[in-house]
A protein has these predicted regions:
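Short, well-ordered beta-strand elements
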Residues: 332-349, 464-468
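Peripheral terminal and inter-domain segments
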Residues: 13, 22, 357-622
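Short, surface-exposed loop or secondary-structure junction motifs
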Residues: 70-74, 128-337, 350
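Low-complexity, acidic Ser/Thr/Pro-rich repeat tracts that form intrinsically disordered stalk/linker regions
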Residues: 18-28
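C-terminal segment of classical bacterial N-terminal signal peptides
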Residues: 9-19
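Sec-dependent N-terminal signal peptides
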Residues: 1-7, 561
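Short, conserved catalytic-motif segment at the N-terminal edge
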Residues: 27-88, 110-112, 119, 127, ...
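Active-site SXXK
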Residues: 39-42, 56, 62, 89-117, ...
Length: 622
């Protein structure tokens, strides 16, 4: 994918210009007024969104305006958030540091952004779908085509090269076709930093970003001496907070492992904004502009991806940003380059992104207001023409081939429901968030009372997907029924259970009859052992697959072997039956009675492999 600034210009030419609203805006240059606004907002909205603790910091025109903390770093201990003392994990905002490192090496002409990444990989290769080359630019914009993947995320740390080599996910899209957020892709960029610079990723980030900016509290590894905030998930039904475990993510460090006190974000944001004494501290002006420019979107009018940053929806000023999620921490960095303004929010509650997004909207409304928008349809679509756009959709960011592929079938992801509410008008409902869009042109809808955009497109397979300006890192597909997958699996399991009961009864009867001449006794014994292994495997597979966010648990590893052994035993059963049938040692009813369980036994392991309930490892066992 070509790297060009033209796409950004095109985007700006098709987005409507906004004038200031008649209401008087708050003064962004009045720090006292800004601080009062922020204090009032967080005092009110943290309870609304059930956020235990938060910290925020603002910079403008090369100066740190203020940092503030709200709520609790630890609910049990009643420890309050202190912006100068409390450490938060920043999650995927780490990706902006990785992207900055890549841009530094690009600036030094050590990396070609349009080069095949295999030029920088040592000891292994990555090939795109249909053998198309994956470029550095593809990794930066999340368009390499990787499937979702986080196996062994918190396993024992390995050298980055080794982990990248052994944990490459499947490819589901050709490079440059769709944006599908990828932690593996950014971890791979971290390895490219190592390969090109000759330093470890940790060393490079420390020597070329953290140290030059004086970010003394920032670290890529957990420091037990730091006052790290606890993080929490909120249960709305029970109205309770649950402390979340600290997940070690060293194997994906370049994708989300940084933690720090919030004032350390000040010099980093100022360096990204090329302001004050931090001008050229990390990158030259033209390199910063290239990093912040739009390099991918499905349509020029949509907000899109830069390198390590994505665009906000159109407002008075263009903004770029990045969010972060790890454990119960939710982080957001928001930059308005034209204004030399930036702020970062740290929260330790799982609803933090809802608070962050609401703050961004409210902040712009008060400090950079625009005139009210009332878009009308420019394309007349009949009720019949609207039908293809409606339905229930889910994000394409799920396991298509990896471990946990069955997850969306038994635990459906969040859905987005789209309904036609009139000619050329769509209502989009995602959770409690509702938007109305009107048709602007074929496959393009614009928010009726806002600046968001909804765009539909066909994939290479002919499937209908859509994407939103407000969420450019994801696409959405129509939700399919889970019934066929569940029904076939349930049928196989019921056959195994029923045949196990019959085999046990048969064995007990055989003990009393002492029928030593039975030709089927050896087969029944082998089949019974195989069934018992399956019955052990199934609860392990279904119970523990969701724990694979970290290191694979021991019970799940046992399931890998038991499934493989059961399958091999059923191959033996099938061969034994063929032998008996050839010798005409069994009658028709006996053959019929055992052929169905044998087929079920032969199909159950492949079924579990297909849905990755026992994972790809079982193939190597077999």
């Amino acid at each position: 994918m070509a790297v060009a600034l033209i796409a950004t210009f095109m985007m700006l030419t098709v987005v409507p210009k906004y004038s200031l609203a008649s209401a008087e805006a708050l003064d962004i240059n009045n720090t006292e007024q800004l601080k009062k606004y922020v204090d009032d907002y967080f005092a009110k909205e943290m309870d609304t969104y059930h956020i235990p603790g938060a910290a925020i910091t603002f910079v403008k025109d090369g100066k740190a305006l203020f940092s503030a903390g709200y709520g609790y770093a630890d609910l049990d201990k009643k420890t309050k958030v202190d912006p100068n003392d409390t450490v938060f994990r920043i999650g995927s905002v780490t990706k902006t540091f990785t992207a900055t490192a890549i841009m530094q090496l690009y600036e030094q002409r050590k990396i070609d952004l349009n080069a095949d990444i295999n030029e920088y990989l040592k000891g292994f290769k990555i090939h795109g779908l249909n053998n198309k080359p994956v470029t550095v630019s593809n990794l930066l914009t999340h368009t390499a085509g990787f499937d979702e993947y986080y196996e062994d995320l918190s396993a024992k740390p390995e050298p980055l090269q080794q982990f990248m080599k052994t944990h490459a996910p499947a490819m589901i899209n050709e490079p440059g076709v769709e944006s599908l957020y990828s932690n593996y892709g950014y971890a791979l960029l971290g390895y490219i930093v190592e390969s090109v610079s000759g330093e470890t990723y940790d060393q490079y980030i420390q020597n070329h970003i953290l140290n030059p900016l004086g970010m003394k509290t920032a670290t890529l590894h957990k420091n037990e001496n730091d006052h790290i905030a606890s993080s929490y998930a909120y249960d709305a039904a029970k109205q309770t907070y649950t402390k979340q475990p600290y997940v070690i993510t060293d194997n994906y460090a370049p994708a989300g492992n940084l933690s720090m006190k919030i004032p350390d974000m000040d010099p980093y944001m100022m360096a990204q904004l090329q302001s004050g004494s931090y001008h050229n501290a990390l990158l030259k002006d033209e390199t910063s502009q290239l990093m912040q420019a739009k390099h991918f979107s499905k349509d020029p009018s949509l907000s899109g991806f830069g390198f390590g940053l994505w665009e906000d929806i159109p407002r008075q000023h263009r903004a770029v940003m990045h969010g972060g999620t790890v454990d119960g921490f939710r982080t957001w960095m928001y930059l308005i380059p034209e204004e030399k303004l930036g702020f970062t929010i740290f929260t330790n509650g799982s609803n933090g992104h809802a608070l962050n997004q609401a703050f961004i909207d409210d902040f712009n409304k008060h400090f950079y207001p625009v005139a009210p928008v009332n878009n009308t349809a420019k394309l007349n679509l009949s009720e019949e023409a609207m039908k293809p756009y409606t339905g229930t959709f889910i994000s394409t960011r799920y396991f298509h081939y990896g471990i946990g592929r069955f997850g969306p079938k038994i635990s459906p992801p969040a859905t987005t429901v789209i309904e036609a509410t009139g000619p050329s008008e769509l209502k989009v409902t995602s959770g409690s968030h509702v938007q109305t869009f009107v048709a602007e042109r074929e496959n393009m809808f614009v928010e009726k009372n806002g600046s968001d955009r909804l765009f539909y497109y066909k994939t290479a397979k002919g499937d209908l997907h859509f994407t939103l300006s407000s969420y450019p890192m994801s696409s959405y597909e129509r939700q399919t029924s889970a019934i066929p997958a569940l029904a076939s699996g349930i049928a196989l399991v019921l056959i195994i259970i029923l045949s196990t009961i019959i085999l046990i009864i048969s064995a007990l009867i055989g003990m009393f009859k002492k029928d030593a001449k039975s030709t089927t006794k050896p087969i029944r014994r082998v089949a019974l052992i195989a069934n018992i292994l399956y019955i052990v495997t199934l609860p392990l597979a279904f119970t523990y697959w969701n724990d694979l966010f970290g290191a694979a648990p021991t019970p799940w590893k046992i399931a890998l072997y038991t499934a493989a052994i059961a399958f091999v035993l059923y191959i033996i059963v099938a061969l034994m039956w063929v032998s008996l049938i050839k010798r005409k040692s069994v009658n028709g009813w006996v053959k019929f009675g055992y052929i169905i369980p044998t087929i079920a036994g032969l199909l159950l392991t492949p079924y579990m492999i297909y849905w990755n309930l026992v994972g790809k490892f079982v193939l190597s066992v077999m």
